[in-house]
């Protein structure tokens, strides 16, 4: 771990407010209720968080649900997006705020990949020294499975193409994803 890694990790994990704004990328998804409206509402709610501004927003994408229980009924398709935010929140506080937004949308977690009214995940947390590497009981950044999921990488590549290589996108071609609404 370099000095830059340590400087990025300590404030992010310790709840210290960064002196300069950080850039975070957040994945949004929903497949219960009015998923399009739920995702759009979450974007507005995140923009209203203290010292937080949504600076980029991807289009909305439709993807098939990932099932995790054998024999479970087919879940509705997801609506997914990725946003870029500028904020002064430590990553742990940002996670708490995102979880409160999920709770207000009646998010429950009965099992892995269960259908959900709202899903908000911190993908990347970056300051002037680069990407923070965070590992706590409740938060891992970069998100551990983001590089395996078209529903994350395609919208991320739309708003931050420098972060996603063409090779990574090519490796996910078999995962169905359809743009349904252009970025607003």
Task: State each model region's role.
Residues 2-9, 66-79, 89-184:
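Flexible, gly/pro- and Lys/Arg-enriched active-site loops
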């Amino acid at each position: 771990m370099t000095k830059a890694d340590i400087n990025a990790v300590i404030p992010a994990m310790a709840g210290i407010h960064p002196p300069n704004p950080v850039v975070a990328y957040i994945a949004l998804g929903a497949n219960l209720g009015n998923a399009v409206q739920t995702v759009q509402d979450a974007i507005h709610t995140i923009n209203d968080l203290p010292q937080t501004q949504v600076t980029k927003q991807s289009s909305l994408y439709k993807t098939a649900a990932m099932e995790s229980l054998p024999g479970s009924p087919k879940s509705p398709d997801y609506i997914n997006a990725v946003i870029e935010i500028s904020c002064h929140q430590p990553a742990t506080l940002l996670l708490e705020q995102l979880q409160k937004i999920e709770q207000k949308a009646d998010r429950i977690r009965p099992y892995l990949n269960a259908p959900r009214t709202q899903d908000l995940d911190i993908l990347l947390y970056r300051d002037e020294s680069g990407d923070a590497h965070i590992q706590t009981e409740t938060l891992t950044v970069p998100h551990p499975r983001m590089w395996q999921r078209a529903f994350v990488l395609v919208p991320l590549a739309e708003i931050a193409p420098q972060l996603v290589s063409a090779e990574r996108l090519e490796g996910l071609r078999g995962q169905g994803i359809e743009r349904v609404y252009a970025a607003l």
